[in-house]
């Protein structure tokens, strides 16, 4: 993205809107014009990037993570605007007074989409994978403080303890956004091959939806997760088609093959904004980069204002 913030318009076909549905507040999503969730139907949309794996860590650093895979995987918790925690897979987290020890407790009613229970074994397996130098997905750095990976020790099937060298708000944020992999789906797979093995085309997930069919680089069809622990989604499922060309996406949208079409230029917007057949929704898309400064580090140069 060349700009930090821009307005993107989502165009919804009025005909497709009749079958369009969204998740409720607990599962995320949108409401109809009257503010009521729309029940049933399948949401169909296109993305430019090809989907080559169902493994979260093969997709977390791209827009696929936000657009697709956050519907398939749940984190430990999400942060509310007031700083409070909206727990998901985690039931609670207790932090020591010095901020170096985190005791995380999982819910005891969470299951993978294939019916297997989610336990701290899955957390240990995921972190063991992230610590492998040959794997080293970009998200692994989030679990390091001063270059050292956190330590972790399973206490029970629902309790695990993390330790870091010093207090770090960024580590707390990273722990909340930890997405775990199903250890039982990778039995016998070397740690160096967890992200590349064939099992990634058909693995269990923890979110509101589960993959029903998957064609690498072409299409992903998802249905409600029958074992989901929170309020079920209002829609029956969604379908993601990999279409790299924006013009081809627009043609499919006009042919009623897609529920939604994303545009980012005024010329294309003019074709839809005054057409009663379509509903145009605009939203700001901001990208924020975080920087952590340690003023106690030595040697530390004299502080002076810095223009970013």
Where are these regions (language model features)?
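Aromatic- and charge-enriched surface segment that lines or borders ligand/interaction sites
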Residues: 91-136, 155, 252, 301-302
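Alpha-helical secondary-structure segments
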Residues: 44, 119-125, 157-161, 207-208, ...
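Gly/Pro-rich hinge or "lid" segments in bacterial periplasmic/extracellular proteins
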Residues: 81, 176-233, 237
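Ligand-binding "clamshell"
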Residues: 270-282
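Ligand-site clamp/hinge motif
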Residues: 226-271
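Short, low-complexity disordered leader/linker segments with a strong preference
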Residues: 1-42, 84, 97, 151
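Surface-exposed binding/hinge segments that line
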Residues: 94, 141-188
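N-terminal lobe/hinge region of extracytoplasmic solute-binding protein
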Residues: 46-97, 128, 204-205
